[in-house]
Amino acid sequence: MANGFYRNHTSKNDYKHTGVLGEIGVGYYKPLDDDPFILEAYIGGGMGTVSKSEVLTNGSESRTATFDARAAKLFIQPQIGYASRFFDMALSPRFSLVKYTNFSSSNYTQAELANDYLDNGKLTDKPFAFAEPTVTVRVGYKWLKLQAQYGLTINIGGGNIRHPDNFSSLGVVVDIAQWYHE
């Protein structure tokens, strides 16, 4: 299993947010006795970066404030689903730990950092734990399928951190083993 994420968001008011994450994992796949139902489990990790730049104004004065951080991630992803030649659907209660390192910021006040939970080393102090329940749907033929995924992101430990409440993705799945054995 290999996943990648890239986001580059710029808004009209001089706000820019970027993020990159790469993940790799290994997994186990087993058809259940009631074929076409399957059980899958993955474990893996990843690394990434996040940065933000924004122009803040106070009356007639303005300043550009920035922050950057690196992150490491570990995850476990059990999954139960239905698989056929043309359609797959799965439910997964994915769990992940994210540890931020190398945090740096400039031109933010202590109050602004505290508002984003970035003050006093809170971001890099300990790992954050997340539950990420997910629904995955795949449509295609045999070893090549289009995948759509939707999930929630729930902070279950490690303290307060700003994060999105949900996520979605669209991608292509290539089952190399099935392709090879055809």
Regions found by a protein language model. Give the residues of each.
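Outer-membrane beta-barrel transmembrane domain signature
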Residues: 45-169, 173-182
